[in-house]
A protein has these predicted regions:
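Transmembrane-helix bundle of Major Facilitator Superfamily
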Residues: 2-191, 337, 344, 352-358, ...
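Intrinsic disorder in cytosolic terminal tails and internal cytosolic loops
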Residues: 1-14, 196-211, 451-454, 482-510
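Alpha-helical transmembrane bundle and helix-membrane interface signal
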Residues: 135-136, 194-198, 210, 234-248, ...
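C-terminal membrane-cytosol helix-exit motif in multi-pass small-molecule transporters
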Residues: 178-198, 224-236, 253-268, 477-487
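Membrane-interface helix termini and inter-helical loops of multi-pass transporters
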Residues: 45-46, 232-243, 309-314, 369-371, ...
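Short, membrane-exposed interhelical loops at transmembrane-helix boundaries
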Residues: 445-461
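Flexible interhelical linker loops that connect adjacent transmembrane helices
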Residues: 9, 185-224, 266-281, 342, ...
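12-transmembrane solute porter fold
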Residues: 16-31, 36-38, 51, 168, ...
């Protein structure tokens, strides 16, 4: 009995050691993504470039991560998730150091590309490794703990960056990333077991003499091109008109590349992403509601700083403290939601989460110039709680609908839906507010709104339209969440698609 308890305790300890090793890398990578927003002005001044040019520091990161995440997830499923994780940490650290040493802005952007490749590798495998380390009946707890870690990293980024930049140059922020990355690498090398984190049928098995499937280079290329076209079109870094020939060509390119990707994947015996997953109502509805949820969440975080500073007159430090409430609510709710979903199932929690999400968005749509700050703070905290409540069980439902050997690419696809939701949410909020203001004669930078009472009124009109739009999207996500019926236990095996659907090539059963 004592020996049995000892083994159980050691298994529990190994599980949490592996989680901590992965969590350190998650915190560092997410921290790096949010800290850079605070440093953009300093970077622009140092290199003597415009704020429009320095925005590529962020854009190139979104492009590379979004384009490479699914291919990296599939590669990890084939060659081993631990390998991809460790190589990603090395690339991320090398890119961070190269950013500091870059003598020109162009080389600094190239270094950011290297960082983003490492970040994509880390995001692609992190979720899958955590789910693989924990037993199926603790999947919610695992994802809840992961989401809390992400919330911590996201919240720490702008706060720490603000303090550091008061005393040190912007390069110090990237040097700060190196010590935790070293710790994450050593911990990952020591505590991550490839056979455990890759699971049965993944890369670990390839070393034992099992046949390794061919990598779907065509699918990876087409998906990367389609996602790159989508991110560039929606983010519109060149500020071209939405009816301009450039924009029309971009939209056509998105449609053509997406159709080509789907056609290609359906014809492959070993596709990068099994499109048959979408025949599962649980998978397809959970993925759609997840994307809609992140569109609404990003709209909040994009417009809220402008509202707090330009409309309510808060200082930057106070604004950061108010915005922290969203991350606090998400972190607290995610941890509890994960544990509760293991006991009571995913559906009640993500239905409740989307309901609260829609309520808080509707409340934010009603805000004006004369509002008590505590009302704003309560709505932001509630929005964070909602995000924590629906995010974790929603992810658990998605991962629970696919076989374990596909967790890498599906975990990467989950993170991709978050990134695309973020891009779409920011684009929607910006397009609505800027469009309404321009229609009222205020074609000015958002940072200069507070100096003009008429501009404030126009901004608030656009604000209400934008939040009304994302409230509608959140209600749609709530309806999908209500219809989602996650299946407990292991997912059923995938049935092959009819030969007619794949041009006569029948995919190999998985």
């Amino acid at each position: 009995m004592t020996e049995s308890k000892g083994r159980a305790a050691e298994v529990e300890a190994q599980k949490w050691r592996a989680f901590i090793a992965i969590a350190i890398s998650f915190v560092t990578m997410v921290f790096s993504m949010t800290m850079v927003f605070v440093a953009l002005s300093a970077i622009a001044d140092d290199f003597g470039v415009t704020l429009g040019a320095v925005s590529w520091v962020v854009i190139v990161q979104s492009l590379v991560i979004s384009a490479l995440m699914m291919p990296m997830g599939r590669i990890a499923d084939m060659v081993g998730r631990r390998r991809v994780h460790l190589v990603g940490l090395v690339l991320f650290a090398a890119g961070s150091l190269a950013v500091v040493l870059a003598p020109t802005f162009e080389l600094m952007i190239a270094a950011r590309v290297v960082m983003a490749v490492g970040n994509a590798m880390g995001q692609a495998v992190g979720t899958a490794m955590i789910v693989a380390v924990f037993p199926a009946n603790e999947r919610g707890k695992a994802l809840g703990s992961q989401t809390s870690v992400v919330a911590i990293g996201a919240a720490m980024g702008p706060i720490v960056a603000g303090f550091v930049l008061q005393a040190l140059p912007w390069e110090a922020l990237f040097l700060m990333l190196l010590p935790p990355l070293l710790v994450a690498f050593v911990a990952g090398y020591r505590y991550l077991d490839e056979a455990v984190v890759s699971g049965a049928g993944a890369g670990a098995g390839a070393d034992a003499g099992h046949a390794r499937p061919d990598f779907d280079w065509g699918g990876a290329t087409l998906s990367a091109l389609a996602i790159t076209a989508l991110v560039l079109t929606v983010s519109n870094p060149l500020a071209v008109g939405w009816t301009s020939p450039t924009m029309v060509v971009s939209v056509v390119a998105i449609v053509v590349l997406t159709a080509a990707f789907i056609s290609w994947e359906l014809r492959q015996p070993e596709p990068m992403l099994q499109l048959r997953f979408f025949t599962s109502p649980t998978f397809s509805m959970a993925v759609t509601s997840r994307t809609l949820g992140f569109v609404g969440s990003t709209a909040v975080m994009f417009l809220m700083p402008i509202y707090l500073i330009s409309v309510l007159g808060l200082r930057e430090a106070s604004t950061g403290a108010v915005l922290f409430l969203t991350s606090l609510g998400m972190g607290l709710a995610a941890n509890q939601a994960g544990r509760s979903s293991d006991r009571f199932g995913e559906r009640p929690l993500f239905v409740a989460g989307f309901a609260i999400h829609a309520f808080t968005l509707a409340g934010l749509a009603l805000l004006g110039q004369e509002v008590a700050l505590w009302v704003v703070m309560a709505l932001l905290f509630g929005n964070g709680v909602a995000l924590g409540l629906w995010n974790v069980p929603n992810g658990s439902a998605i991962l629970g609908a696919v076989p374990s050997e596909h967790l890498g690419v599906v975990g990467a696809f989950m993170n991709l839906t978050r990134n695309l939701g973020n891009v779409l949410g920011q684009a929607l909020a910006s397009a609505v507010v800027v469009g309404v203001m321009a229609a009222r004669g205020f074609d000015i930078p958002l940072s200069k709104i507070g100096a003009n009472p008429g501009a404030v009124t126009a901004f608030l009109h656009g604000w209400r339209i934008a939040y009304a739009a994302v409230t509608v999207l959140s209600v749609l996500a709530l309806a999908l969440a209500w219809l989602t019926r996650p299946t407990p236990g292991s997912p059923p095996p995938l049935a092959p698609l009819p030969a007619s659907a794949v041009g006569g090539v029948r995919p190999r059963p998985t």
